[in-house]
């Protein structure tokens, strides 16, 4: 599933990419806001671009109805995109709290997301708790768990810092016990 991000492109660029993807028969897309630029304190949308993934989902769903940015409606051309969005079992690092993070996820689903792919997690209880919170919030689309194997002891440092995820102590101990044997760590 190709990711499509808001950052670094305008709505017109996104529409062009979607037209190309549709022409090529790529009908699944993962709609993401994308990360902030390296030297910026927060995400800044591209000129005439989207600030949020929910806006990108709305644009994709409009194309599915044959509605294009210039206001034209092409009755003969309706795309058939299935749209996935990101969900965060441990909360998006930029969210004020888990409740606001869940509200934003619901906005993406209400905008037309067909499924959710979660950020990686290493404690299954966090995933199951997340699914339960989603269902209680009225989010009923499929929730696909994001999986990332730990293939090197360096991941014990890099993954939590980079992706704001936690690692269970039991897993940390098991990987550290493997030393530099990356095959055993896998």
Each predicted region: which residue ranges?
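Active-site pocket-lining/capping segments in soluble small-molecule metabolic enzymes
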Residues: 34, 47-80, 85-94, 136-186
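Active-site glycine-rich loop that binds ribose-phosphate moieties when present
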Residues: 94-111
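Catalytic cores of alpha/beta
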Residues: 9-22, 100-104, 128-135, 152-159
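Catalytic beta/alpha-barrel core
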Residues: 30-32, 114-123, 186
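Conserved, mostly hydrophobic/aromatic
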Residues: 21, 108, 112, 145
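Structural preference for beta-strand elements that scaffold enzyme active sites
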Residues: 1-3, 27-30, 80-84, 114-115, ...
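Flexible, glycine-rich active-site loops centered on histidine and acidic residues
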Residues: 10-58
């Amino acid at each position: 599933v190709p990711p499509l991000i808001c950052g670094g492109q305008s709505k017109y660029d996104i529409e062009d990419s979607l037209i190309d993807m549709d022409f090529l028969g790529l009908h699944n897309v993962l709609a993401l806001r994308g990360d902030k630029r390296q030297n910026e304190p927060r995400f800044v949308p591209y000129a005439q671009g989207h600030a949020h993934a929910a806006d990108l989902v709305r644009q994709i769903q409009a194309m599915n109805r044959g509605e294009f940015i210039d206001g034209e409606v092409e009755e003969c051309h309706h795309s058939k995109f299935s749209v996935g969005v990101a969900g965060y079992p441990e909360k998006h690092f930029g969210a004020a709290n888990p409740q606001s993070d869940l509200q934003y996820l619901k906005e993406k689903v209400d905008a037309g997301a067909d499924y959710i792919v979660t950020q990686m997690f290493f404690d299954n209880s966090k995933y199951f708790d997340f699914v339960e919170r989603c269902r209680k919030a009225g989010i009923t689309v499929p929730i696909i768990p994001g999986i990332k194997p730990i293939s090197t002891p360096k991941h014990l440092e890099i993954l939590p810092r980079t992706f704001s995820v936690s690692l269970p102590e039991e897993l940390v101990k098991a990987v550290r016990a493997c030393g530099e044997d990356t095959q055993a760590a896998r």
